[in-house]
């Protein structure tokens, strides 16, 4: 499996904003440059980590690819000595998309024994998490430990919770203080930044990465290569359009494209959220690049090269179309590139192989740009009512949960007890029936987790393909304005930032139902009201006070 976060891929494309209503509750401001530096934990590489088969490749802007592993360690080494807990009793809430494990199951019991605490896991429905948590915060009844996904900061008003209902971890983890916890100290600095509000550290990152790319334009590598088409032949938008013509055969029910707008627009250098020109904020909707990208996608939608179901807005069956070869090119989050995808694809077509095009520029000239998304989007927090000794106990537990890939602790957290929850099949930890029922990736790892790695035991080619593509593209990563910055925005402006009326028209345009001029009209209406207010607020409250975070 890939331990890169497979949830919230699109969330990586947004600033880590929180929203507040019109009340007078305390709200955390953004971070100052000096305050952020003081709050962040020191970074110390983990000497207990298992050596990867494919080493990370460094890029610019603090970017680096995730390490790759082609097999699971036969004898997982320990990264923690002794038992971290001291017998405390706590509750924890994490979002769960799926069936909740039985209460008090054997995996929970094994974890509590290893952790030295009585940690009662209370996974909550992930689909309704955005409404479940505000009910808790309104009653001021948060659990001792909770996961608050950053893409829901606006729903939760996280900026209003830090320091009031959520504990300040700065005294325990900032600077060299984190060195007491080697597994936590090895997490990327950018990931810790997602949990800093108002120059204080509150959050513990899960599934962190220095390769925070929201997604890519994927293609059926097996099909295209059989037609003599390789990824390095695609250097411009025209190249893609020409391939679309070559691959589409409507009579056989094959179309070249599914939806590609979300992750392809950067080929025109459309900004992620904002651009700064001569000290002034410019929204993507205001740029010529946005209109040029949209024009190309409108022409694609009306070319006959896009699958009719995609044009009709059918997202749910996109993977099925891709696996069956009915559509051959489509955008998606990087979490799709994993062993499960390979297994589903091979079940539909034994020759199935996923590939991704390298970053391109629309005109085939110059250097491509890939805007970095957040280094972590799953963040956990501790309750402000906890005593210092309790906070220290749970941080020690978090250090255990953050044990690197392939260690003894990682194996227990992710696979349970060998012989009970998993057995080794060809060297790969494989769940038993009890393990399938009890061990959930969205429970303990949503409280703390190691940095992401790429590993697909039994699907080594997937790991090789993914890491090869990552290595070829990491040099294009760059941080957009306000990268990793947390700030509290009025609810009305958070809605303005989402621009639902524009995005509805935009979607109709890249599906060929409305013209570019219709989108321009929607943008003009948005700019004249909420758009201008949003820009002014961002200028006055973030850019002028704290800079762009770069």
Regions found by a protein language model. Name each.
Residues 1-20, 329:
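N-terminal export signals
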Residues 20-29:
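Bacterial lipoprotein signal-peptidase II cleavage site
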Residues 45-47, 51-73, 155-214, 264-266, ...:
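Hinge/lid segment of periplasmic solute-binding proteins
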Residues 60, 66, 71-78, 396-508, ...:
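Conserved small-residue motifs centered on glycine
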Residues 85-98, 117-122, 145, 202, ...:
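Short, well-ordered beta-strand elements
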Residues 113-190, 196, 222-228, 232, ...:
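Extracytoplasmic "Venus flytrap"/periplasmic binding protein-like
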Residues 196-263, 276-317, 321, 382-392, ...:
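Helix-loop-helix "hinge/cap" segment bordering the ligand-binding cleft or interdomain interface
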Residues 262-272, 298-301, 305-441:
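Extracytoplasmic/periplasmic substrate-binding proteins
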């Amino acid at each position: 499996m890939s331990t890169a976060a497979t949830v919230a891929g699109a969330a990586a494309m947004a600033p880590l904003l929180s929203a507040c209503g019109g009340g007078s509750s305390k709200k955390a401001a953004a971070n100052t440059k000096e305050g952020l530096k003081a709050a962040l934990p020191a970074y110390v590489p983990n000497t207990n980590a298992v050596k990867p088969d494919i080493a990370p490749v460094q890029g610019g802007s603090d970017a680096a690819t995730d390490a790759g592993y082609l097999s699971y360690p036969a004898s997982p080494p320990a990264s923690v000595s002794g038992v971290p807990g001291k017998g405390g009793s706590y509750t924890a809430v994490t979002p769960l998309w799926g069936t909740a494990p039985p209460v008090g199951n054997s995996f929970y019991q094994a974890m509590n024994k290893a952790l030295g605490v009585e940690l009662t896991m209370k996974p909550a429905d992930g689909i309704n998490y955005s409404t479940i948590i505000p009910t808790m915060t309104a009653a001021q009844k948060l659990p001792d430990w909770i996961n608050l996904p950053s893409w829901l900061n606006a729903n939760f008003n996280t900026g209003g919770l830090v320091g009031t209902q959520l504990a300040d971890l700065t005294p325990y983890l900032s600077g060299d203080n984190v060195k007491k916890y080697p597994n936590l100290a090895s997490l990327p600095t950018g990931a810790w930044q997602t949990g800093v509000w108002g120059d204080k550290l509150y959050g513990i990152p899960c599934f962190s990465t220095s390769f925070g790319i929201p997604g890519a334009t994927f293609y059926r590598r097996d099909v295209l290569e059989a037609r003599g088409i390789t990824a390095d032949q695609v250097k411009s938008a025209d190249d893609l359009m020409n391939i679309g013509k070559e691959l589409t055969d409507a009579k056989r029910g094959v179309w070249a494209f599914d939806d590609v707008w979300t992750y392809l627009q950067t080929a025109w250098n459309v900004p992620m959220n904002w651009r700064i020109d001569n000290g002034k904020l410019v929204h993507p909707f205001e740029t010529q690049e946005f209109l040029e990208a949209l024009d190309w996608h409108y022409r694609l939608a009306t070319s006959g090269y896009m699958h009719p179901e995609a044009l009709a807005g059918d997202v749910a069956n996109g993977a099925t179309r891709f696996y069956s070869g009915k559509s051959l090119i489509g955008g998606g989050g990087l979490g799709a590139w994993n062993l499960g995808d390979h297994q589903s694809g091979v079940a539909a077509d034994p020759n199935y192989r996923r590939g991704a095009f390298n970053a391109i520029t629309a005109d085939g000239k110059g250097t491509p740009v890939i805007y970095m998304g957040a280094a972590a989007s799953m963040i956990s927090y501790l309750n402000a009512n906890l005593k210092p000794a309790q906070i220290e106990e749970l941080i020690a537990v978090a250090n255990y949960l953050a044990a690197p890939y392939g260690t003894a602790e990682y194996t227990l957290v992710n696979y349970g007890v060998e012989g009970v929850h998993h057995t080794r099949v060809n060297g790969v930890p494989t769940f038993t029936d009890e393990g399938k029922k009890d061990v959930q990736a969205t429970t303990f790892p949503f409280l703390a987790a190691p940095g992401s790695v790429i590993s697909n035991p039994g699907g080594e080619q997937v790991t090789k393909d993914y890491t090869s593509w990552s290595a070829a593209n990491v040099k294009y990563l760059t941080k957009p304005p306000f990268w990793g910055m947390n700030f509290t925005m009025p609810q009305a402006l958070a809605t303005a930032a989402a621009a639902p009326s524009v995005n509805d028209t935009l979607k109709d345009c890249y599906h060929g139902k409305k013209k570019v001029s219709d989108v321009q009209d929607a943008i003009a209406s948005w700019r004249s009201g909420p758009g201008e207010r949003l820009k002014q607020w961002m200028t006055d409250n973030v850019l002028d006070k704290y800079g762009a975070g770069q």
